[in-house]
UniProtKB/Swiss-Prot annotation:
Gene3D superfamilies: FAD/NAD(P)-binding domain, Fumarate reductase/succinate dehydrogenase flavoprotein-like, C-terminal domain, Succinate dehydrogenase/fumarate reductase flavoprotein, catalytic domain
GO biological process: NAD biosynthetic process
Broad enzyme group: oxidoreductase
Gene Ontology molecular-function annotations: L-aspartate oxidase activity; nucleotide binding
Protein name: L-aspartate oxidase 2
Length: 536
């Protein structure tokens, strides 16, 4: 990718803190930052589109006398398969009760039974510890917090803009370049503190559980700003996506299996007892691979999930939204088995950060799914993600408050257009490459083919695109490439990464890809980007 000749000065807006993203981690951060800070939130979405909004199952927290922190920690470490940071796990788990109480205070209408918060159980959990809002927990939490954030006078929403590049010298950040999705106008937003809370990269897969999933843009931007990327090969595939004719209709929450749902293959055989002593409640990577194996063995596109034995009234009471969704597609969850198959659901790795979101770049923070703070390791325990979002958002706010500075107004001259090898169908190509070669089951040959396909995409005849459009293409390409590089570097199978040519575990190590500072807004250096990525 190289710069065009035409340059133009673009407008600039100045903030104390810039937040990229609008999910649960971002909202928690905003509610904990002091009102003295001028905060800008760059959001490409409407309120109902962040991944947090689509979370069905719930939020895990020790909130019962039958449970304790050590049990939750042990379950998390077991699911993480040797790659969790135990200190991070302990910190986040031990704040679970406080998190739940804080959310209640914010007006989150958790489902109750006999006056007490109803706790369900999900895969990998040894106790009932998942609080929920019916079967649409994310929506319930997000609506409550959105109402609170809307009252903050110091928060300026920059809607229908997509961040395309960080302003960084490889040591510190000074702002964000973003493109208007309405008219393509490019704007510099300057700030000494930038918080990335933009989600993961499951939108780069052909089948994903969130219809508006992020595509790794923030991960790519952070990497090009110099941030270290960790464990990006660990993409979690949710075992039970409700699919009709090859299209994902909805996630079927793990809580369905937690409340007694059973899995059957097309031969009407329960198969999970043959894969795990935990049966349907095994960790997600185990269940996803088991379903994949059954689909391969029988040549089918799905298996069956059945909870009809619990009775119509029970299912309608516990899963009203799922009953409505499945009923609308002629397959009522309360009365029939439903077809399910795995789909990309969560990015367990991400930008290397601590629990407060601090990265190796001064002023750059990463919180929520976009970050790798060490909680999830090689595989996320069900319903730990919403807990992580709140804990990281709160801790990040404290760190930002302690270190916040003042921004200098930036005047940049950008190329109006950039020469790029990418084309309008790039996303479809990337989704096919990752699904086929970095999916549920991987191989040395498949990963090699995937990397070759990526190289071929870079060798296509160059076109000239507007600056923002070219950078959006570069971001999704870089994110997909980083997944393949990370997966190829891990010569073992662990958690969400299964390579049939390296089926056993090796020594537990974190995969790290150091950041390669490359800025397309600066003159003269752009042509080196492809070579730097290939050498990463």
């Amino acid at each position: 990718m190289t710069s065009g000749q035409s340059k133009h000065e673009i407008r600039d807006m100045k903030f104390d803190v810039l937040v990229v993203g609008e999910g649960l981690a971002a909202l928690t951060l905003l509610l904990h930052l002091p009102p003295s800070l001028k905060i800008g939130v760059i959001s490409r979405n409407k309120y109902d589109e962040p991944s947090s909004y689509w979370a069905q199952g719930g939020i895990s927290a020790v909130f019962s006398t039958d449970d304790d922190h050590d049990k939750h920690i042990r379950d998390t470490l077991l699911a993480g398969d040797g790659l969790c940071d135990e200190a991070a796990v302990r910190q986040i788990v031990c704040e679970g009760g406080d998190v739940l109480r804080w959310l209640i205070d914010q007006g989150v209408p958790f489902t109750r039974e006999d006056g007490e918060i109803h706790l369900t159980r999900e895969g990998g959990h040894s106790e009932r510890r998942v609080a929920h809002v019916d079967d649409m927990t994310g929506r319930g939490i997000m609506r409550a917090l959105q109402a609170k954030v809307a009252q903050l006078p110091n928060v300026i929403w920059i809607r229908q803009y997509e961040a395309v590049e960080l302003l960084s010298d490889g040591q510190a950040v000074s702002g964000v370049i973003a493109e208007s999705l309405a008219d393509g106008e490019v704007t510099v937003f300057s700030a000494p503190t930038v918080v990335l809370a933009a989600g993961g990269l499951t939108g780069l897969y052909q089948y994903a559980t969130n219809p508006h999933a992020s595509k790794g843009e923030a991960i790519a931007m952070a990497w090009r700003a110099g941030a270290t990327i960790e464990n990006l090969e660990f993409v979690q595939f949710h075992p039970t996506a409700f699919q009709i004719e090859g299209r994902v209709i909805s996630l079927i929450t793990e809580a369905v299996r937690g409340e007694g749902g059973l899995l059957y293959n097309v031969a009407n055989e329960r198969f999970m007892p043959g894969y795990s002593s935990q049966q349907e409640l095994a960790p997600r990577d185990v269940v996803a691979r088991a379903i994949y194996s059954e689909m391969q063995a029988h040549g089918t596109s799905h298996v069956w999930l059945d909870i009809t034995h619990q009775g119509t009234a029970f299912v309608e009471q516990h899963f009203p939204n799922l009953v409505e969704i499945t009923r609308a597609h002629g397959c009522d969850l309360s009365q029939h088995r439903v077809p399910v198959s795995p789909a990309a659901h969560y990015t367990c790795g991400g930008i290397g950060a601590d629990v407060a979101g601090r990265t190796n770049i001064e002023g750059l923070y990463a919180i929520g799914e976009v970050a790798n703070c060490g909680l999830h390791g090689a595989n996320r325990l069900a319903s730990n993600s919403l807990l992580e979002c709140v804990v990281m958002g709160k801790a990040c706010a404290q760190s930002v408050t302690d270190t916040a500075g003042s921004a200098s107004r930036l005047r940049l001259t950008l190329p109006e257009r950039i020469e790029t090898p990418f084309h309008p169908n790039l996303l479809a190509d990337l989704r096919a490459i990752l699904w086929n070669h970095a999916g549920i089951v991987r191989s040395n040959t498949g990963l090699e083919i995937g990397l070759q396909n990526m190289a071929q995409l870079q060798e296509r005849h160059a076109s000239v695109l507007p600056y923002g459009q070219a950078l959006r293409a570069q971001n999704i390409f870089d994110a997909a490439h980083l997944v393949l590089l990370s997966a190829a570097a891990r010569k073992e199978s662990r958690g969400g990464h299964f390579n049939k040519d390296h089926a056993d575990k090796a020594e537990a190590q974190t995969t790290q890809i150091p950041g390669v500072p490359v800025n397309f807004w600066a003159a003269g250096e752009n042509a080196s980007h492809a070579a730097q990525l290939a050498a990463a």
